[in-house]
């Protein structure tokens, strides 16, 4: 049996129903939360969520405030490479990746 919990919730989603449920879980279990999105979900062009990195972060912070989630909350990014731009030439795809990295950081 595990005597000490050494892991924390970490999710890679842009679904705000899932994010809300995860924040509530972390809140009531007094855990930090790590949230990531992929470059397909959120990027400088909006991704398939139509959210840019700063918009995604803002929506997360608004949600956290709404449900009074005051635990440690980390926002990360997953797969910042050129995959969403695989149909572009290599140089343009890499430039898009670099721009996304800068927008996220």
What are these regions (language model features)?
Residues 1-74, 84, 93:
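Alpha/beta catalytic barrel-like cores
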Residues 81-105:
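Helix-rich catalytic cores of soluble enzyme domains
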């Amino acid at each position: 049996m595990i005597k000490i919990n050494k892991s924390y919730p970490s999710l890679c989603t842009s679904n705000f129903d899932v994010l809300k449920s995860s924040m509530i879980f972390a809140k009531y279990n007094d855990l930090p939360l790590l949230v990531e999105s992929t470059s397909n979900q959120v990027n400088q062009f909006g991704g398939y969520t139509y959210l840019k990195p700063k918009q995604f972060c803002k929506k997360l912070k608004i949600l956290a405030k709404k449900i009074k989630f005051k635990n440690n909350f980390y926002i990360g990014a997953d797969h910042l490479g050129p995959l969403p731009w695989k149909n572009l030439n290599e140089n343009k795809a890499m430039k898009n990746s670099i721009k996304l990295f800068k927008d996220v950081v």
